[in-house]
Amino acid sequence: MDSLAAPQDRLVEQLLSPRTQAQRRLKDIDKQYVGFATLPNQVHRKSVKKGFDFTLMVAGESGLGKSTLVHSLFLTDLYKDRKLLSAEERISQTVEILKHTVDIEEKGVKLKLTIVDTPGFGDAVDNTECWKPITDYVDQQFEQYFRDESGLNRKNIQDNRVHCCLYFISPFGHGLRPVDVGFMKALHEKVNIVPLIAKADCLVPSEIRKLKERIREEIDKFGIHVYQFPECDSDEDEDFKQQDRELKESAPFAVIGSNTVVEAKGQRVRGRLYPWGIVEVENQAHCDFVKLRNMLIRTHMHDLKDVTCDVHYENYRAHCIQQMTSKLTQDSRMESPIPILPLPTPDAETEKLIRMKDEELRRMQEMLQRMKQQMQDQ
């Protein structure tokens, strides 16, 4: 029996040996493993738990399908209570700023989407500086964020800055109109502008190509800075690089929106039914809607937010700090012409409050001086 048991024990030992060796190798690897490679997962979990926010502005004259396109992009109706105005009412109304906010969740990821609409833009007989309320709104959001960022409670700052502006260009012209040029030049240093050719189903493919070329030429001619797609990293796969090339070649995007589901080749798709056929919203042979959606939501949403924060907001912030520094310098050089009267002796509590305020003012002045020095060094 012992002679039979010995081969069995050796066989079990041989079978267990690879597993034991693998466990030993894992233990050795575990000893060398620090753990910071899990940082991306930690950031991902924290970001998903917190959720994301994105503010999108839509601008352009009435009747170009702005509301329909927003509904098609996010599959959410933000204009349920909208009142349609007559032609006379549209002409007489002034430019308004309307915000629509909705919380969207997809596969556990939460997005707080804010759509900033601009009804009345470009509808008047005289459209001189009709973009002024819009530029004022963008500046107000920068100012509010700057105040919140400079305050004491910076933990839960609400970001209402405009991250992207979809500007709708009429397909019925021969390029950019003066109001288009004026709007984009007024906002191109404040927000990421993505120009769109609206209602692309009104044009044949050759007309769309000519209009795109004309708009690109005029954007360069007038020195308009639209949103620039970032360059691909060298380690990106070929499919992503090809997609990036197609995006850059397709700008400005010619888009179609539709909330209607139609039957096409045995499938139900969103599109428009005409006597001569069906235009499918998500058919890339018909329009650039899919490219716009991929760019705006799936590939470049975070970059739009980064450019807003690192470029447009930083320019505004630097301008504010320069103004504050200049004002402090002027105030320090001025001598008051009014004689200072002796004040009554303050009590202990008032004296303590004054000391705290003086200390706070001194810290702010030192901070501004350091910022000024850093800006001069740069």
UniProtKB/Swiss-Prot annotation:
GO terms for biological process: adult behavior; cell division; regulation of exocytosis; social behavior. The modification Omega-N-methylarginine is found at R177. Residues 117-120 are annotated as: G3 motif. One of its GO terms (molecular function) is GTP binding. Phosphorylated by DYRK1A. Filament-forming cytoskeletal GTPase. May play a role in cytokinesis (Potential). May play a role in platelet secretion. This is Septin-5. It comes from Macaca fascicularis.
